[in-house]
Amino acid sequence: MRLPRILVALAVTAAVGSTACGAEVQQPAGAATGAAVTVTNCGAPLTVEGVPERVVTNDTGITEMMFALGLADRLVGHTSYPGKERDIASSPWKADFERTPLLGDAFTREVVQAADPDFVFAGWNYGFKESTGLTPDWVRSIGAVPYQLTEACRQPGTDRRGVMEPLDALYTDLANLGDIFGVRARADQLIAQYRDQVAKAAAGAPAGQEPARVFLFDSATAEPFTSGRHAAPSQIIREAGGSNIFDDLNDSWTTASWEAAAQRDPQAILIVDYGAGPENSVQAKIEQLRTHPLMAGTTAVRENNLLALPYAALVEGPRNPQAVVTVAEFLRSRGY
């Protein structure tokens, strides 16, 4: 079926490609001195004794942060999710993925322990879950350091996630990793580049015009899974000149309702492309929107203002700044 005026951006690579290879990464200072480094991670001090040498990561965006910092040689392996091949194919760090052992599509205690890591980088609902017993405390129990993705830090006294602006979470993790691995100059270079990229995209938003209402559609069974205020898409949309219709939800990735989504009448819809299975494909999600009795009448669906971006562009990671550029260009092309 021909889908007019639907832009499916399978790769967010143009502006991040320059950071994907050829970076001169300084020798970690801790490798020579053995000095301990303490950073703040999810509101608590985290001390790392020396530079980690056997790192396990979970999820594409997390792994790409290590690659962007030039730390591929520190990884003993990574885990991902079924269908990640599309994410990896579109990655500016594809060559690093090909050189790094894939430990599997499941982040489990058995997989992690078998890799004998000294540092595990994951996040709540990005691998860490009480239901599986794979938690930061368990990582400590096997003698490794757990580092938590800042986008997924839990708010005090609750399991809701998000304690700062999503892009600030990215910059925080890059700076922390820079300190831990002795590559802070590289981290600062990336942070400055990303801030500049985002600022230039934000400056292009039309003056005197209400931001476009944007719905982030991740997936759905009974109700849609979407981005609240603290997930990366909310700030990506805002910096691009739009407004996340669920920015009032004090969480990161969370469940909303079709009724609420339709009532807020999105003018554009941002679709997460997992590249996984026919039931979770971009095409299937588009058909779901077009045939849904409430969503079919929204401005975004009627006018085919639908943009798909790779999963790794929309979770915290080094593709976020280019995602801002891509969403901004899309909104401008639709008159917003």
Label the model's feature ranges.
Residues 2-65, 176-217, 333-336:
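Bacterial Sec-exported substrate-binding components of ABC uptake systems
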Residues 61-64, 81-84, 119, 125-129, ...:
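Solvent-exposed loop/turn segments at secondary-structure junctions
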Residues 108-119, 134-137, 142, 256-265:
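Short helices/loops that flank or line small-molecule/ion binding pockets
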Residues 164-173, 248-249, 270-336:
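Structured C-terminal subdomain patch of bacterial secreted/periplasmic proteins
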Residues 226-253:
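Alpha-helical, coiled-coil/dimerization segments enriched in small aliphatic residues
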